[in-house]
Amino acid sequence: MKVKRPILLAILDGWGLAEPDKGNAVDNANMIFVKQLKQTYPWLKAHASGKWVGLPENQMGNSEVGHIHLGAGRINLESLAKLNHETKTNNIAKNDEIVKTFEYVKKNNSALHLMGLFSNGGVHSHFDHMIAIYKAAIVYGITNIKFDLITDGRDTKPKLAYDFIKNLLELIKQNNNIGIISSVSGRYYAMDRDKRFDRSRIAYNAIVNRNNVRSFTNILDYIQQEYMINHDDEMIIPAFNQDDFNGNLKANDAIIMTNFRPDRAIQISSILTNKNYIAWQSEAFSDAEFIGDKIRFVSMMKYSDSVTSPHIAYPPKPLTNTLGQYLSKLGLKQLRIAETEKIAHVTFFFDGGNDYFKNGLAKNDEITLANAYIDLIPSAKVATYDLKPQMSAVEITDKLLEEIKKDEFDFIVLNFANCDMVGHTGNNKATEIACKTLDDQLKRIHDEFVLKHNGIMVITADHGNAEIMIDKDDQVNKKHTTSLVPIIITDKNIKLKQNDPAIAKVAPTILDLMNIEIPKEMELESMIDHN
């Protein structure tokens, strides 16, 4: 089977819509070609947050749920909503894996470590879930509880960890001082996902080895000291509690990792559980002690096959007949292309949790989805992406144009990470450069794919970010938004429906463009108006 006109889904990560403002990097970048696209082709303002992507009302969207819904064609109740329900009903205290972990700790007279991103951002985690497990452990009779906290500052305002941890200390006091904050680490270190193992090693030392790493005697003083040297929550240097020097993770201990979103939990969790994981062959871990075979590790959700612990509190239920899977069954040839930072998003997440591409790292002969191929473009090795706001967008486009010229693919999924990853740095001017870079790349792609190869581009985003770099309090905003996002379709011969456009309707719309029947699993309709 071959489609008449190939489709290219271009996902501009973190590219939202907002009123003109000094903090609107999208608008201030003067994306001339995008303006031309909007004047030439039909386009919509679409929902990409809250109930439209399976999240609680008014919850900002994120890259994971955005890509899931772009490929799903249905609203999928997401991890945050599920775990909020489990917490509200206290079912989390009855979860089989969690209860068995309590039993394990009591049997071994060992420590229970609660590790995760401690914030209310709701993108990777929510501290309510960790606190619920903490309270359940106390009820179960566990008294040796260690908190290995990861601070946020990226999906929240930059400096909220102080107040969050102050409240946790008060909660510990209210519970007869059961529990201690054993270590702290900014997510820059503990939640790296780009194989920067030197960062992971510092976090690992704070949790496990207690050597060659900072320490503190008062966690709140330590955070204040970090703030004074312009380290916000994301960048807090890992440290352990001197009053809990022997409270490091050790043999017979258990650790519950409370992050529910996989991508930034994979690396540190794989290091903690899998001696064959590539980090252990790196220079950063050449002299580290591995204890993963002597502990019980529980993840809230399935992260990756590289996390070798079998203990998953809420095992996944991957979606069926997502766009990529459906096109594969029909014999259509497809390509996924992105840089390292977002390769999992155009594979694992876009495929509804089905790991056909080994979380984006598979070689083409290892892909288990028929007729599917991948181009992984390395991300730049820089400390933060405002140092290179172009990221790897030009290199992605160069490779994509090579692929387009082959005339082989019926469907291409492309991710440009710039608006999101540079937006997360809080650097407004750098984010404007990032947006302008994408404007230039879109023109290159359009001129080749649409004008020379008769293709149709569907240009959209997974969530907002770069359009609000300064919040209503005139503070730097590094987090995602609830903004609407554009959907531009480069076909002058169609009209688009204006009733409740949403990114979850992109998959059926693409099938409609291909003149292919929409499967029953895709419960949402196409946005093309045939009247």
Swiss-Prot record:
Catalytic activity: (2R)-2-phosphoglycerate = (2R)-3-phosphoglycerate
Binding site for Mn(2+) 1: D420, H424, H480
BP-aspect Gene Ontology terms: glucose catabolic process; glycolytic process
Keyword Iron (UniProt): no
Cofactor: Mn(2+)
Stored Gene3D superfamilies: Alkaline Phosphatase, subunit A, BPG-independent phosphoglycerate mutase, domain B
GO cellular component term of the entry, any: cytosol
Keywords per UniProt: Glycolysis, Isomerase, Manganese, Metal-binding
Lineage: superkingdom: Bacteria
Record GO terms (molecular function): manganese ion binding; phosphoglycerate mutase activity
Top EC class for this record: isomerase
Family: Belongs to the BPG-independent phosphoglycerate mutase family.
Name of the molecule in the record: 2,3-bisphosphoglycerate-independent phosphoglycerate mutase
Organism listed in the record: Mycoplasma capricolum subsp. capricolum (strain California kid / ATCC 27343 / NCTC 10154)
Lineage: Bacteria, Bacillati, Mycoplasmatota, Mollicutes, Mycoplasmataceae
